[in-house]
Each structure stands twice: as structure tokens, then as C-alpha cells.
Amino acid sequence: ISSDQNASLGNIPLNVKINSDDEDFPYQNEVLIEVKLSLNQYGFPSNNITIKSSPLIADLNGDLYNEIYFGSDDGKFYGLSKDGQNLDGFPFDAGYDIRSSAALGDFNSDDIEELVFGTSQGMLYVLNHDGTLNMNYYAPGKIWGAPAVSDLDGDSDLEIVFTTENSN
């Protein structure tokens, strides 16, 4: 089913005609049904999660479909499939509000990118693509901003740059 690009959101009446040309069992019926046209898609929106940062969209599990990664005020870092379902290994329980958007980088040189984000209690987490903890680091203060990832010193290893509310 498709709709005109100018169609209004809401319930759209759809008249379905059912016919059988079988001579032994002729059949004809007309059924009126309503189809709901909305901007939501299967699995979305996700309710009961307060998100105050931008999501990261990437295909980290190699299935050729992008996943959605984000932190929330319930202290969990989520990984969702294209249909809004939790990925295996997610959510990761960081224990504190996550307002930092995530960044990506291959921090252990295994050619697989990891996720990095911060919490309201100064914890910086690096997660493997499957939601398991790779490493963490504590810095005094709240990490509200997204970490930046770059090879700052040219040694082929990525550095993580972030700030805290305490100017650290």
C-alpha cells in the first residue's frame, strides 16, 4: 500500500473488492477498512525513554542495516535495530544519566569500531559493538558533551577528547 505524498495523516478509508471468477463458487464482496497513515513505523516511537542527546546511526554488527545508538536519563545506553528492537547485548547499564552523544572509533586496532560516551557522574565508557564493556575512565564532573575522536599525535592510535562540567 502506498499513499500520495500530499495525503493527510490519520485514518484513510479503503474500499476492498473481492471477486472470484470460479463458475462453481462465484463470490463477490466489498469491504470497507481503514488504514492509519502516520509518520511512525514498526517499533517506533519508543516510549518511556527520555533522550537528551543526538543518536548515532551506524551499522556496527555488519548486517548491512544501520542501527540506532543513544543514551538516556534512565542510565542506559541503547542499541536498537531498524525495527526498534533492542540489539543483543543492549541496553548497557551505565548507572547514571547519559546526555552525551556517542562517537565511534577503533580504539583497540581490531578493525571494528567501538562506541564511546560519557555520563552525568564523569564516567567515560567505551563499548564494543555487541554492548560489552571495552574500557571506562573516570573524570571529575559531568560529561554533557559528545566526545571527539582523532589521532592527535600521528601515532596511528585514536585519542578521545572530552570535557566535563568542571572544566576538566
Give, region by region, the residue ranges found by the protein language model:
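Accessible peptide chain termini
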Residues: 1-2, 131
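Short glycine/proline/serine/threonine-rich loop/turn segments at secondary-structure transition edges
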Residues: 5-14
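Extracytoplasmic/lumenal domain signature
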Residues: 21, 25-168
